[in-house]
Amino acid sequence: MYFTGFADEAGKEIDTQIRATKELGWRFIEARQVGDRNIHDLDDAAFDAVCEKLSQAGISVNCFGSTIANWGKAITDPFDSSLAEARRAIPRMKRLGTRLIRIMSFAVLKDRPPDDQMEEERFRRVGLLTRMFLDEGLQPVHENCMNYGGMGWTYTLRLLERCPGLKLVFDTGNPVFSDDRTKPPPYPKQSSWEFYQHVRDHVVYVHIKDGTWDPATGRIRYTFAGEGDGDVRRIVTDLLRRGYDGGFSIEPHLGAVFHDPTVETEAETRFRTYVEYGRRFARLVEECQKSLQQ
């Protein structure tokens, strides 16, 4: 078991991301944004510079937090851009010695019901992307987010059935604000524990996020791990009980909300919040481990 995180929430530049990781005493980063671009979209010179700085610092990238087929990509859009992102990511993952890459299953078509989401085209595209990575010895992991698989655990299982070799990264916080489309409308929010229970046999990686849903504002209020409704402590304990030895990747959303560029804090506050989040979560894991020894 190891700790990692979306260090771009500590700071945009790779130097800051490395500094936060080293302050936590960790050896890994889940690489997403460097500057204003995803790691698979950096120009060659910028990527070379990132590789050199990581190497000098002794920090490794355990996963590419790619934008491939994510919530910003429509299934009705041409597939070419997703294929191009995958082709750019593969050689960069190999250079960094990174085996995991986070992908999704395209945005939910909000004007259509759950049973009319162009499933077959989604399965075709995600299946092709999965094979592209597997053929190169790399492992794609699907995140339950604002995408087809994130509509509920039944949709995730259907996706896995139709895309052989695809595995899961389970995000503890996303169900808190996601409609549960396995149930009839008006859709309630999902239960992280319920979702996790149904898909845990396929989980090889975990994103740690937490929060509470505010019906009055229609927004999620992000919290430190274990302080919200994401069932973080319960899920972590169950994973450890089952012998989980993969990564826990923190995605605080407290000092920087990646999906909303209007939410900003001062640079040092972002940095300190990320480090504090990591320290608190490490203590939570230690407490979960001790509870299993009692």
Language-model region placement:
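Glycine-rich, proline-tolerant flexible connector loops at the mouths of alpha/beta enzymes
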Residues: 30-55, 106-111
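Acidic/histidine-rich catalytic cores of soluble enzymes
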Residues: 64, 128-229, 286, 292
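Acidic (Asp/Glu)-rich catalytic clusters
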Residues: 18-24, 41-63, 87-97, 127-135, ...
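Hydrophobic faces of well-ordered beta-strands that scaffold small-molecule active sites
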Residues: 1-7, 29-31, 61-66, 101-103, ...
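Active-site-proximal loop/turn and secondary-structure-junction residues that shape catalytic pockets
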Residues: 9-11, 33-35, 67-70, 105-110, ...
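Aromatic-rich peripheral "rim/lid" segments of glycoside hydrolase catalytic domains that contact
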Residues: 255-294
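Charged helix-capping and loop-helix junction motifs
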Residues: 42-49, 79-87, 115-127, 153-154, ...
